[in-house]
């Protein structure tokens, strides 16, 4: 008989039920040629991890205070922001970011930013049910001893409008302590990691069609071993076409992920996973001024692929949705 606890899985399987509540209050004040914003937000996470016989529940509250400011001085734009977050488990942590932009030629701008970050592990990563378990492997187990990520990052870029092409190129450098990842079938902390990358984005319109292209080169490495981090492709491409035929909106998206490395836990070795290409298509139609219907086909050509070694991803998927505004 069907059991809502086990779903379509075996009776011994454990499943997670995650609930989140979020409240935010903010205010914005115009100052000179810019603005100052501030506020408070609160988030509560609840996790129930249960089988047909046992159930464990966990809860965590996080309260944050934030302040941001932006000011335009001639051709220079300055921004700064800061946050203080109190995590019920990990206590108080402060983060900040600053950025500057300079329009050195009409239509062309240089930007530079630096900031810090903090990311607590999710309740699912700490206490949740084992994920992706199957007859082929034990899955990925939670780890209650996970530490939060702490990071420093800088980014420099140039953007401009050259003829019909709106483009941006940027370089970034992230230094992360206690990066949350998984290996040997369990969530872990990578003590120290560095992620460096170069990204180019471009947007251009040709007749009724808009083109959006993103090219990325990423070098993600474990600082202790010098190895490339698992499941992270160095080369990534995303190309999207969007357009409209009368009232019908349409889009076609292509995504390419280059080769990645992963951990073959059963045989104690690293494996190289080849690159993959995926296509998605979507349509959107306003039936009335209030009702819009959307359809999407993901993995259009029903490609067999894996983003994680040993775990087959979904084949072709069909989605139909609608939204109604009052």
PLM ranges: what are they?
Residues 1-103, 168, 205, 210-212:
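Face-selective signature of the C-terminal outer-membrane beta-barrel domain
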Residues 1-15, 48-56, 90-96, 123-129, ...:
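Outer-membrane beta-barrel translocator domains and adjoining extracellular loop/strand segments
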Residues 16-19, 103, 107-109, 113-177, ...:
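Outer-membrane beta-barrel signature, preferentially recognizing the C-terminal barrel domain
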Residues 18-26, 43, 60-66, 93-95, ...:
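Transmembrane beta-barrel architecture of outer-membrane proteins
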